[in-house]
């Protein structure tokens, strides 16, 4: 499940769902590989602006040109995104940021990742999630082969 409850600022809980594990959809080894690949996007690729000091972050950026009414693609109209999770060792939050026609930046790595970072930092702080990475963001992980 993706949502187990909805909590409002006034403390009201709107929905509670039972967690029911049905089946494993990916092999453990596949999950490990995908985590490394998605972490690499944040450490060395287009998702660098999603880095959070002290926390491992993994995710994928996205950029798409919108269709033009005249046919083909509209050159200056984009949908950009970043979907990521943190902390890597024991993920607590999965966040999807989608921006329709961002005003200034037209790539997921420049427009959506800072929004992800701000939301994730707020959630990690609000829920008291302890850091899972050393304070230094540039770890030896970037040298690992994927």
Question: Can you describe what each PLM-predicted range is?
Answer:
Residues 130-146:
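Short, highly charged C-terminal tails/helix-capping segments
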């Amino acid at each position: 499940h993706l949502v187990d409850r909805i909590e409002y600022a006034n403390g009201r809980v709107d929905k509670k769902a039972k967690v029911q594990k049905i089946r494993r959809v990916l092999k453990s080894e596949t999950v490990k590989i995908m985590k490394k690949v998605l972490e690499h996007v944040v450490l060395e690729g287009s998702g660098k602006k999603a880095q959070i000091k002290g926390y491992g972050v993994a995710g994928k950026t996205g950029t798409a040109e919108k269709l033009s009414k005249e046919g083909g693609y509209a050159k200056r109209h984009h949908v950009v995104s970043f979907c990521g999770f943190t902390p890597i060792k024991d993920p607590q939050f999965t966040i999807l940021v989608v921006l329709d026609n961002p005003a200034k930046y037209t790539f997921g790595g420049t427009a959506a990742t800072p929004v992800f970072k701000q939301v994730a930092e707020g959630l990690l702080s609000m829920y008291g999630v302890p850091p899972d990475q050393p304070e230094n963001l540039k770890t030896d992980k970037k040298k690992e082969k994927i």
